[in-house]
A protein has these predicted regions:
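C-terminal capping/lid segments that line or modulate ligand- or cofactor-binding pockets
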Residues: 72-92, 129-185
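Generic alpha-helix signal with a bias toward terminal, lower-confidence helices
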Residues: 17, 97, 117, 169-170
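Extended amphipathic alpha-helical segments enriched in small hydrophobics
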Residues: 5-26, 146-156
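Alpha-helix C-terminal capping segments
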Residues: 22, 105-106, 139-143
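Arginine residue identity/basic-tract feature
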Residues: 19, 23, 34, 102-103, ...
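Extended ligand-binding clefts on enzyme/binding-domain cores
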Residues: 1-12, 25, 31-133
Length: 185
């Protein structure tokens, strides 16, 4: 669909920074008002079209919407992503809608969540099935309050380099010698 929710959320956060710059440095109240209005419209659109009710997870964020009631429920490994929302500054880790969304995207209900003998995490429609991205594993750790989960994710990243000692774009959850973009580190 045409409206990517994480991208719009990131834009909302950036507009806050831009507003501060325009207000404090450029002292341009007209431009500041336009920024505030645009941010309001984006946030309103997210609230209106980007939050869905899932029968198992409750209120959660969609990944994409068309603005007509249709939506895509998934998450992609790249940033901005739904998983990265607290890191980006859109919400806190304990936000209920975020936590419901997190439970969804870190489950097999997310079509790009993979689990194997070497790793489990979020992959992408841009790489092969059963491949997870270290960037998503890192973001999962950065947005977790669970020390055991964080340590498990760090170990997963360190132990899945295909014996190259480099992080790659993605790697197979069952065989880390199979990876994409060896120059990606």
């Amino acid at each position: 669909f045409n409206y990517n929710i994480p991208g719009n959320m990131f834009c909302s956060v950036i507009l806050n920074y831009l507003r501060e710059i325009v207000r404090d440095i450029y002292k341009d109240s007209y431009l500041e008002e336009r920024i505030v209005d645009l941010k309001f419209q984006i946030d309103y659109g997210i609230e209106l079209f980007g939050i869905v009710h899932h029968p198992q997870y409750g209120k959660m964020y969609a990944y994409e919407t068309d603005g007509y009631g249709n939506h895509v429920l998934m998450d992609d490994a790249n940033v901005p992503s739904l998983l990265s929302l607290p890191y980006l500054g859109y919400c806190n880790e304990d936000n209920e809608i975020y936590q419901n969304t997190r439970r969804f995207i870190l489950s097999h209900d997310n079509p790009y969540y993979y689990e194997g003998t070497k790793a489990k995490g979020i992959g992408s429609p841009h790489t092969w099935k059963e491949y997870v991205w270290p960037i998503a594993l890192t973001m999962q750790a950065l947005t977790s309050n669970d020390e055991q989960e964080i340590q498990t994710l760090i170990d997963m990243i360190v132990n899945n380099t295909g014996d190259t000692r480099y992080c790659h774009e993605s790697f197979d959850v069952n065989d880390d010698s199979q990876y994409t973009r060896p120059w990606f580190c």
